[in-house]
C-alpha cells in the first residue's frame, strides 16, 4: 500500500514545478523591467563632466559625454568665448555713398572720358581778359 501513497506525492511535486517556473519567469520579467527603468533613467540623466583625458577605445565609449567629446569630436562648450568686433561708426559709410557707382566698382573709363572732355573745353576757352 505504500506505492499508491507515493504516487500522489510525486504528482504533487510535479504540480509544484510549473508554479516554480512561473515564479522564476515573473522574477526574470521584473528584473528586465528594472533594467529598462534603469536604462531610461540613465538616458534622461544630465551629462556629467569627466576628468579622464585618455583617448583609448575604452575611455571614449565609457559614457555618453566622452563618446560625444572624444569619439565624435562634438563639444558643447559655452559659445560666449567668441568676442565680437566693435561696431563701426557710420561716418565711413557716408562718403562711400557720395561716390559714384563707377568709382566704387573700379570702372575708371568714365572718369578718363570726363577728364578728356574737361581738358578740351579748357584749352578751347582763351580766358576772360588777356
From Swiss-Prot:
Residues 79-91 have a biased composition (Basic residues). It is found in: Host nucleus, Host nucleolus. The modification Phosphothreonine is found at residue 89. Keywords: Activator, AIDS, Host nucleus, Host-virus interaction, Phosphoprotein, RNA-binding, Transcription, Transcription regulation. GO terms for molecular function: RNA binding; RNA-binding transcription regulator activity. Belongs to the lentiviruses Tat family. This is Protein Tat.
